Amino acid sequence: MKVAVLXAAGGIQALALLLKTSLYDIAPVTPGVAVDLSHIPTDVKIKGFSGEDATPALEGADVVLISAGVARKPGMDRSDLFNVNAGIVKNLVQQIAKTCPQACIGIITNPVNTTVAIAAEVLKKAGVYDKNKLF
């Protein structure tokens, strides 16, 4: 089973430590995170990818976790988060729909109540929506 963690350069690194699989973020430090995690002595292989194209991280993925986006800062309200994070989630889900449409997708990008709905609409438009695989 292959798990892809999208936005692996942020605070999700602790989870990536447990999963040790395919990491992606637009931040150029992501391959370095992968190297750091690869030094942990297990049989699991880990790869890190950065840049605008998440395809290499998504190829063959059975599970995709999206944690990408900006965190809420003091003075921000949920609509501020939505304005930024909705576009990020939309872009990543479009790439998932093309590269690994059969994958289960977990979204923890805030505001979750709207980012999951956006993901559902993107998947429906691509003809690959499965209500049992989006959470």
Swiss-Prot record:
Q: What SUPFAM superfamilies does this protein's entry cite?
A: NAD(P)-binding Rossmann-fold domains (SSF51735)
The protein's UniProt keywords, in alphabetical order, are:
NAD, Oxidoreductase, Tricarboxylic acid cycle
Q: Which residues bind substrate?
A: 72, 78, 110
Name the cystine pairs: none
Q: Report any one BP term from Gene Ontology.
A: tricarboxylic acid cycle
User: GO CC terms on record?
Assistant: cytoplasm
Question: Which Gene3D superfamilies is this protein grouped with?
Answer: NAD(P)-binding Rossmann-like Domain
Tell me where the signal peptide lies: none
Q: What is its EC number?
A: 1.1.1.37
Q: Which family does it belong to?
A: Belongs to the LDH/MDH superfamily. MDH type 1 family.
- The name this protein goes by in its record: Malate dehydrogenase
